[in-house]
Amino acid sequence: MTMFGLQLLLTAAVINMLVRTDEEHGLRADWEAGCILLTGCFAGAGYIACAHGREHPMIWMIYLILAVYLTVCVLTDRQTCKVYDCLQLPAALFGTALCMMRPVPAQGGAALVCFALLQYFLFMRLYGRGDGMTFQISSLYIIGAGGSLETLLSHMAAAFALLGVVQLVRGNINRKGNLKLPVPFLPYIACSLLWFL
């Protein structure tokens, strides 16, 4: 089975699990959901093949879990403005495994702690808890790829910049610089993460 096929299968299984366990899930099988699934699977499989094709298969699995996590979270955030807590633990565990498999300097560990404190005490007030947890999980993968605190903050800035540009083009920003209508933030977090892995 190809990486794309495996990611599509795992993503569908996770969505099926969410539908079965949450009676008020609100997820719809529509054109937009299909586009999110295909885009997420192509982006995940493409990234794994291009950036990690020659590495150990365990590295592929770690990034596959991240790709499934982000694809499902983008779909649920887009359709229901919900990020399921049950998805956080597997993605965080595999991100931690990545940090343990690669030589992460002490500055990387300090960056994770500092970033976590910034998220919990400052930034989560600007956006939802699910978005904050996604930034936290992304930070594990960024540090595992050799990133620093500056990289983590740059990822946040890029996500906000991408959100701002797209919403400006859509005419969803008022004169004070705020969003007229709230929009899901997780798609912008996921897209900007590809630049920093």
Residue ranges with predicted function:
Residues 1-197:
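A membrane-topology feature that recognizes alpha-helical transmembrane segments
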